């Protein structure tokens, strides 16, 4: 929102939603927000990327829908456009993959299982103005491969995961996706 506030709305189970509840108000513009169990405790936490402060962070859910303070994963995601939670190294916890607009980088951060994350691991720097990331097992080998959308090169691409978090070179799906901003599967 324009107030840099992240909200959530509780589903009542019949398609209706309760009142707006604040997760956090952060000092920088959130670009992507999603829910994922990042600390392995069985409830959904909030993952967010912020473009103005180059930050990817998460907010721990205490189990009752109350969220803690911002837990920074990285402040090195240059103009952070997207963050997506997925198990990239096959250890059973959710890691985080990111898209950096200013430095054309697709990268990931390994989760230690309790919501602490390791250093940035670069997958590629060939996504010119990276806008979005997603993961799916594209080659049917049982691990999650990474997809990216980048706007200045009009590209949708993917990166083959070797099963333990190592990635092959960029494989272009299309370089005619005019101003590519999103990619998903389904």
Question: Where are the language model's segments positioned?
Answer:
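Extracellular beta-propeller repeat domains
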Residues: 3-5, 51, 101, 151, ...
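Short intrinsically disordered, low-complexity coil segments enriched in acidic
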Residues: 1-11, 16, 186
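Calcium-coordinating acidic loop motifs
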Residues: 12-13, 36-43, 62-63, 86-93, ...
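Beta-propeller blade termini
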Residues: 31-38, 81-88, 131-138, 181-186
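Hydrophobic beta-strand segments that make up the repeating blades of beta-propeller
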Residues: 1, 46-50, 96-99, 146-149
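A short loop-to-beta-strand structural motif that recurs across blades of beta-propeller domains
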Residues: 5-9, 55-59, 105-109, 155-159
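Acidic Asp/Glu-based divalent-cation binding sites
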Residues: 45, 54, 95, 104, ...
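Blade-edge motifs of beta-propeller repeat domains
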Residues: 10-28, 60-78, 110-128, 160-182
């Amino acid at each position: 929102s324009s107030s840099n506030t992240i909200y959530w709305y509780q589903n009542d189970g019949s398609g209706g939603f309760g009142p707006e509840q604040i997760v956090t108000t952060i000092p920088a513009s959130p670009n992507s927000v999603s829910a994922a169990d990042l600390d392995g405790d069985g409830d959904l936490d909030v993952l967010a990327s912020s473009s103005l402060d180059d930050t990817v962070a998460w907010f721990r859910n205490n189990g009752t829908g109350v969220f803690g303070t911002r837990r920074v994963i990285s402040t090195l995601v240059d103009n952070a456009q997207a963050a997506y939670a997925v198990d990239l190294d096959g250890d059973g916890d959710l890691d985080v993959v990111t898209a950096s607009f200013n430095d054309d980088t697709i990268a990931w951060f390994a989760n230690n299982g309790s919501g602490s994350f390791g250093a940035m691991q670069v997958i590629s720097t060939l996504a010119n103005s990276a806008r979005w990331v997603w993961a799916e097992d594209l080659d049917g080998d049982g691990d999650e491969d990474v997809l990216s959308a980048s706007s200045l090169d009009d590209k949708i691409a993917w990166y083959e995961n070797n099963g333990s978090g190592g990635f092959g070179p960029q494989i272009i799906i299309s370089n005619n996706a005019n101003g590519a901003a999103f990619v998903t599967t389904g």
